[in-house]
UniProtKB/Swiss-Prot annotation:
It comes from Bacillus mycoides (strain KBAB4) (Bacillus weihenstephanensis). Belongs to the PPase class C family. One of its GO terms (cellular component) is cytoplasm. It is found in: Cytoplasm. Its EC number is 3.6.1.1. It is an enzyme of class 3 (hydrolase). NCBIfam families: PRK05427.1 (NF003877). Its cofactor is Mn(2+). Keywords: Cytoplasm, Hydrolase, Manganese, Metal-binding. GO terms for molecular function: inorganic diphosphate phosphatase activity; manganese ion binding. Mn(2+) 1 binds at residues 9, 13, 75. It catalyses: diphosphate + H2O = 2 phosphate + H(+). InterPro entries: DDH_dom, DHH_sf, DHHA2, DHHA2_dom_sf, Mn-dep_inorganic_PyrPase. This is Probable manganese-dependent inorganic pyrophosphatase.
Length: 309
């Protein structure tokens, strides 16, 4: 039987990795030869989840057409966030919870996108719909994905469905969602030993906003100053990325997991859009973004609307 690769976006977060593993397992149970893979490095937060439930991380690939003809996308749909040669393979399915942009296929596909906080929440439903029992280890990874995407249920993207799914999965996994979740987020917020290049690419996504090319990277921290003490070095590597990719804006968002506020560091010719979008004045290229924790709900749509205005 021909193999199908299942993967999340480049610079994968916990949902991208864990949902790839969980969905590949479901597809295997349903008779498909599916393998989860990843398009980038595994973060400290995700590694904590994998170690906690004793699951091996998926192997890394840069291209997919050299291995398979068919793929399944989880936690993304936009071409620029996917495998480098995504145009050379057939996308069989997409399971996602983001905006739909820069995506089209030549054949009809199974496309499931729901306005929930996490792909794993959708997968929890799909396991039930197919009558497949979720293994303890996989339930733990799916729980980890929901905790990560919802910032332990504090993000405005978090829905009642996400919370309910997390409670169900925690029971299967045999952990307390809140205490485990805090440990996992703290592991993800430990940025010691990371280079500046790693910091700005740990969780970075590229977007087309009107005519503008924008990259938004986000890291979680227990104290934003722990990251911003390196601002001069960060600006240097961000400027290099802006020049290499021809970006109009690079927004580096440092989110405090305790206060649920963020600080944005903006570089590029379109930094004025950040000021306009959030009614702030950038001082030394930074501004506090009160109550902003979600790239998907509080940054991407706000900036897109401002760019298109």
């Amino acid at each position: 039987m021909e193999k199908v690769l299942v993967f999340g976006h480049k610079n994968p977060d916990t949902d991208a990795i864990c949902s790839a593993i969980a969905y590949a397992e479901l597809k295997k149970e349903l008779g498909m030869n599916a393998e989860p893979v990843r398009l980038g490095e595994i973060s400290g937060e995700t590694q904590f989840a994998l170690d906690s439930f004793k699951v091996e991380g998926p192997r890394f690939v840069e291209t997919v057409a050299n291995e398979v003809d068919n793929v399944i996308l989880v936690d993304h749909n936009e071409r620029q966030q996917s495998a480098n040669d995504i145009e050379s393979v057939r996308v069989l399915e997409v399971i996602d919870h983001h905006r739909i942009a820069n995506f089209e296929t030549s054949d009809p596909i199974y496309y499931r996108c729901e306005p929930v906080g996490c792909t794993a929440t959708i997968l929890n439903k799909m396991y039930k719909e197919n009558g497949v029992t979720i293994r303890k280890e996989v339930a733990g990874l799916m729980l980890s994905a929901i905790i990560s995407d919802s910032l332990l249920f504090k993000s405005p993207t978090c829905t009642e469905q996400d919370v309910a799914a997390a409670r169900e999965l925690a029971e299967i996994a045999g952990v307390d969602a809140d205490s485990y979740g805090l440990e996992m987020l703290k592991a993800g917020a430990d940025l010691s030993g990371k280079t500046m290049e790693q910091l700005i690419s740990l969780d970075a996504k590229e977007f087309q906003m009107g005519n503008a090319k924008v990259e938004i990277a986000q890291v979680n921290a227990v104290d934003t100053n722990d990251v911003l003490v390196h601002q001069a070095e960060l600006e240097k590597v961000i400027t290099t990325v802006v020049e290499e990719k021809g970006l109009d804006l690079f927004l580096f968002v440092v989110t405090d997991i305790l206060t649920n506020d963020s600080v944005g560091l903006a570089i590029g010719k379109a930094t004025n859009v950040v000021e306009k979008a959030y009614n702030v004045t950038l001082q030394n290229n930074t501004a506090t973004l009160k109550g902003v924790v979600s790239r998907k709900k509080q940054i991407v749509p706000v900036l897109t609307e401002t760019f298109q205005a």
